[in-house]
Design a protein with these regions (language model features):
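Nucleotidyltransferase catalytic core that binds NTPs
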Residues: 1-185
Length: 185
């Protein structure tokens, strides 16, 4: 089983680490690849591709040999969307937070994105992923393409919270050290 964990990781937090660790423990035969979004994606305040990649390398090493990081999206000449990336990682399970899942209809190549791929959804506090699925005809029809991690202990940490507050306990010590060394955020 191949698990691809995509996102901005701006920066990678303890929540990202704990989700990846949980998935590797739950799926003993799985390998996990972090797939950071390129700065070519129209998202404000992303630090450089290289810095986010290096921070994910730190997280991957801490997780062990079944975790790695891909430059696939970072090295594309233009942002083409998750659908295009999942064509490259054919047959994988794509991990996303419920905050992103709530807007999946707006993603490039929806509904084919949902029809042709499998997803692992990580709920956040207050999210009702099942209600979201049942409220949408395509999501309901392809319900079997979604694994919802309802048994995962929800963590109320986010990269945006770190960027806003600079609260150091949101990050792994090694990531925090990297951020301080390079004067990021």
């Amino acid at each position: 089983m191949l698990i691809v964990y995509g996102g901005a990781f701006n920066p990678p937090t303890k929540a990202h680490y704990q989700i990846a660790k949980y998935l590797l423990e739950k799926y003993q035969d799985a390998n996990l690849i972090f797939l950071p979004t390129s700065t070519k994606y129209a998202k404000a305040d992303l630090v450089s591709n290289d810095h986010r990649y290096q921070m994910l390398e730190i997280v991957s090493k801490k997780l062990g040999k079944r975790a790695s990081c891909s430059r696939y999206e970072l090295d594309q000449e233009e942002f083409k969307g998750t659908y295009y990336s999942l064509q490259h990682f054919k047959g994988c399970y794509y991990v996303m937070g419920a905050d992103n899942f709530n807007y999946i209809e707006k993603w490039i190549n929806y509904p084919n994105l949902v029809i042709e791929n499998k997803f692992i959804i990580v709920p956040r506090l207050g999210d009702d992923v099942e209600a979201k699925i049942l409220s949408n005809e395509i999501l309901t029809k392809y319900r079997d393409n979604f694994i919802v991690l309802n048994d995962f202990k929800k963590i109320d940490l986010s990269a945006s919270l770190y960027r806003k507050t600079k609260e150091e306990d949101i990050l792994l010590d090694e990531v925090l050290e990297y951020i301080k060394m390079h004067n990021l955020y």
